[in-house]
A protein has these predicted regions:
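Phosphate-handling catalytic cores of nucleic-acid transaction enzymes
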Residues: 30-258
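Short, small/acidic-rich helices and loops at N termini and domain boundaries
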Residues: 1-47
């Protein structure tokens, strides 16, 4: 090299050629010896100082996971017989079962009924099925199978027909997120979209009367009216399918705040 390995001289020479020999501001000298000594060496792993990220969802208070009375008895049975106990799901299922049994029998001073709509969200293979199974077992053992609604609903009119025959019905729908996506699909027929609409209407009509659809042929297709329908929904789903299925339309329609 022209400067006999003198890097400072080389830099000054290059600066003169580029017209930047004199800096606009003073620059303090930098000791590069430590950097050159460590060149080529493997860096030591840095100590982890950041705290583990915390969930933004608060833990459920223990008091809410151990209710009293019949709800608590059902919760304890669900947990005691489960391979993967899920207290939150057990409470949700027990509430829906008791809400069904009490359907059209009790009301608050403001007219509220027991037509609950609860969605249990848990990861895949987290044991969502067990609580639904216990609900069915209890209703079957108590000879109350008439309360059990279908696990799939083909159309809005199918929902109306079921509730007209059994005004108190418990619908337990697995993969509820996929169900929402299916009924919202633009390629789905109007009979699918009517399912959610009828859930909303029957929820609101629990304190009065649900008035069905008027058809042109009143003789063969009369209007179906249902006094105080008690439609209880217990859906289970995974976060991956449920949250993408929610949108502003559910807020605008009022369906989201009914869950």
């Amino acid at each position: 090299m022209q400067h006999n390995n003198d890097f400072n001289a080389a830099i000054k020479s290059a600066a003169r050629q580029l017209g930047i020999e004199k800096p606009r501001a003073s620059v303090p000298a930098v000791d590069m010896s430590r950097l050159l000594e460590n060149a080529g060496k493997e860096p030591k792993p840095s100590k982890k100082t950041d705290a583990e990220p915390k969930s933004i969802i608060p833990e459920t208070p223990n008091l809410l996971l151990a209710p009293a009375g019949m709800v608590g008895t059902i919760v304890q049975h669900i947990l005691a017989t489960s391979h993967q106990p899920q207290p939150e799901l057990a409470v949700a299922a027990a509430l829906c079962l008791c809400a069904t049994v009490l359907g059209r029998r009790v009301a608050t001073s403001t007219g509220l009924r027991t037509n609950l709509q609860i969605i249990g969200v848990a990861k895949t293979a987290a044991g969502k099925e067990h609580a639904r199974k216990i609900n069915k077992d209890i209703l079957l053992a108590s000879r109350s199978s008439e309360f059990i609604g279908g696990e799939e609903i083909a159309s809005g009119q199918g929902l109306v027909s079921r509730v007209a025959a059994h005004p108190v019905s418990l619908f337990q729908i697995d993969e509820f997120g996929l169900f929402l996506q299916a009924v919202q699909n633009p390629n789905a027929g109007s009979h699918k979209a009517e399912i959610v609409n009828n859930f909303i209407k029957m929820f609101s009509a629990a304190t009065s009367i649900y008035y069905g659809t008027e058809y042109a042929d009143q003789r063969t297709r009369p209007r179906v009216d249902i006094p105080h329908p008690c439609v209880v929904l217990y859906g289970t789903t995974t976060p991956e399918t449920f949250f993408p299925a929610l949108g502003s339309a559910h807020v605008a329609s009022g369906y989201l705040n009914r869950m």
